[in-house]
């Protein structure tokens, strides 16, 4: 079975003085999280689309989906974790308790604040995961990448052609993630930023899915303005 996991645990502190997490801010008259979940619900390969958010926002999130997603029977809202990968583990526990977990259980994990993910990107993630391949959605780095170990002086300027910017989805077999994550030490878990790094740290091959420059993560106030523009273009297509 294939499950979507929409990660909505962010608090939106970088968005400035807002009264709710950024995933609940609106673009085009609808909350960002609704736009994102709609993209997953449109794909009938998902058994369930699991939305993970802070405990205090669960009821609010359910109300949003009742309002904006009349056919939301495949959407389940549950509590996320303190950090990203703990949130993914919560999704795996939900799957295990309600559907069972085996080596063919696939998860397509995605940021709630990336509402412009395309059908093509989701499909390619699913196809690779069904082949037993771990995958990460990326785009080539277009700016020069500068490394600084102290935040003040350049340590190195690596060759840009070997570097990519990570996006989401990230997709994999849920059982493999659970096993590898449980093997990590506390120190290893502290340096993790996403699911792909769990596999890389354990020596597993992670392949690339070509993302899109417009598959942006809405993080800062400027991103909201850009998202409104992108949404206008999306509606014209």
Regions found by a protein language model. Name each.
Residues 1, 47-49, 74, 133-134, ...:
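Residues at the starts of beta-strands that form the adenosine-phosphate
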Residues 1-59:
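N-terminal glycine-rich phosphate-binding loop and ensuing alpha1 helix
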